[in-house]
Amino acid sequence: MHHGKPAFTGSAKVTSREMSNWIADYDRSDTGEDIPPESSESLAFSASQILSSPLPRALSSLKALDLEPDVIDEVFREADLPVFPMPGFRLSPTVWAVFFRVMWLCGISRDVERVGTAKKRAIQAAGILAAFAKRSDGTVLLMGHGVMNRLIARELRSLGFKEYRCQGSGYWNASSYRLQ
């Protein structure tokens, strides 16, 4: 499940240099008063095991659902965004984030985790989820993040899991998988 909407909004437009602070503030942000939709609540309440990223927006999403994680692990945290100096531009953080993520996906990572390393982490995360699913009597819920959730989903499919339900990829949305 993708976490709820973070409370942090920050400035409407920032320079590329200011994006480092914006990203740090975003990573420290919880979900504030964001309320999960009923569909997310019912999915989450059906879970017999709950795993989570350690980032505040994931943990506060579980709190909004009145749930506690069984496991909190760095392996589930979002892939960091690199920041590239591009003087003279003031853009919305969303535009910068898309640009920086595309650069990252192209293998240009500067001083953050490389895409290949994140993919290896996704393999590890999928292995953890698969192990919990095999041991569990019910559903396993991961409260995670957009990019890492997609990378983990790819690895779950490679392990023989099949997606049988997808709400989308936005806040509070989830995809469900079964081992075939």
Give the label of every model feature segment.
Residues R17, R157-Q180:
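Domain-level recognition of soluble alpha/beta enzyme cores
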Residues V75-R90:
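Signature for phosphate-centric chemistry
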Residues A64, E68, F132, E155-L159:
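Active-site catalytic microenvironments for nucleophilic, acid-base chemistry
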Residues M1-H2, L51, G138-M148:
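Beta-strand elements within well-structured catalytic alpha/beta cores of enzymes
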Residues M1-F76, T94-Q124, W172, Q180:
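Active-site-proximal alpha-helix that buttresses catalytic centers in soluble enzyme cores
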